[in-house]
Amino acid sequence: MRTNTTATVLLAAAVALLLATAARGDGGDGGCGKEDAAAGRDRARARGLKIAAFFSILVCGALGCGLPSLGRHVPALRPDGDVFFLVKAFAAGVILATGFIHILPDAFDNLTDDCLPAGGPWKEFPFAGFGAMVGAIGTLVVDTLATGYFTRALSKKDAATAAAVADEEKQSAAATQQHNHHHNHHVVGDGGGGGEEHEGQVHVHTHATHGHAHGSSALVAAVGEDDKETTLRHRVISQVLELGIVVHSVIIGISLGASQNPETIKPLVVALSFHQMFEGMGLGGCIVQAKFKVRSIVTMVLFFCLTTPVGIAVGVGISSVYNESSPTALVVEGILNSVAAGILIYMALVDLLAEDFMNPRVQSKGKLQLGINLAMLAGAGLMSMLAKWA
């Protein structure tokens, strides 16, 4: 899993570099959109708001991502508790609305913008919808291939362990039989009738214990195997979900950091803080269920919390050359947004909502089933309302 974290870091760096390079305005762009952008410019006020956004988004992301981990200390928030299902459903609704309401419309706007060349293909084909479809299908492929790969690797490891245990049991059984054979001969030599009775007792006791041990081992092995597969599934889900979040978080951060209009930044600070917190709740829930080691948990949480703030810092650094209305920037941002939307929509519907909604615990409790439906609608509704400001 460390390889996946490294890949996520490299992806974030590549997205930031790509946007920074693509957003440089050049003479061929005709200064499209620069007049509107210059209307409310105020560098001093904008800088203060960006600093506030940096820390606000960082803290809210940490709070959201850390909330599910409180289950270790608060019984109500344990992964197998009803409250945890409600929190995850709410967060999944937020992620679903993020894909449908926030990111996908932005992708359509970018790829149909008036600043794009009139003779280009961008207005003749719905590239934003196509990108979302590719993102969803790509996530499905990665999801299934990764799960299959790690499941096969786990099965091979378990098979090797089982073979080693079987060999050890055979050797132990052979040693026990040899010991019993020697002991029985010694007893028979001391007295005929008593020796036969004692030998029978040893024989019955050995087989009863042997059968009991094998029955318990089989039960423990079956439960352990199921738990391993579930944990493995959650690990794949958390890694893929973080990949989708990273792509659009970098874009959001760079766009906010490059803006010089305080009236544009001000509502974004509040909206993105809530957005980061709710999204963090969804990711944090997956991380807790994945049962990562402490080092991996800290790495994933820190990376999630820092992605948007670092994007803001990058945006501030390139603000003097950044032109979000340049054709190249519009195309790159639109494609990345559409793919990110497809990833998040797939993850929310398939890996988060469908999995929890079909969970036997939820299916057996009518009130919990109603509760997670309402929680999902609340999360999607609140995130949709934020689209008015962000």
Swiss-Prot record:
Presence of keyword Cytoplasm: no
Spans within the Extracellular topological domain: 26-50, 104-124, 257-267, 318-329
Location (main, coarse): membrane
One annotated GO molecular function: zinc ion transmembrane transporter activity
Cytoplasmic topological segments: 72-82, 146-235, 289-296, 351-369
Cleaved signal peptide residues: 1-25
Subcellular localization: Cell membrane
Region (Disordered): 165-199
Chain positions carrying an annotated carbohydrate: 4, 110, 323
Membrane topology summary: Multi-pass membrane protein
Domain of life: Eukaryota
Family: Belongs to the ZIP transporter (TC 2.A.5) family.
Function: Zinc transporter that may mediate zinc uptake from the rhizosphere and may be responsible for the translocation of zinc within the plant.
Further remarks about this protein from its record: Plants overexpressing ZIP8 show decreased zinc concentration in shoots and mature seeds, increased concentration in roots, and are shorter than wild-type plants when grown in field.
Protein name: Zinc transporter 8
Organism whose genome encodes this protein: Oryza sativa subsp. japonica (Rice)
Gene: ZIP8
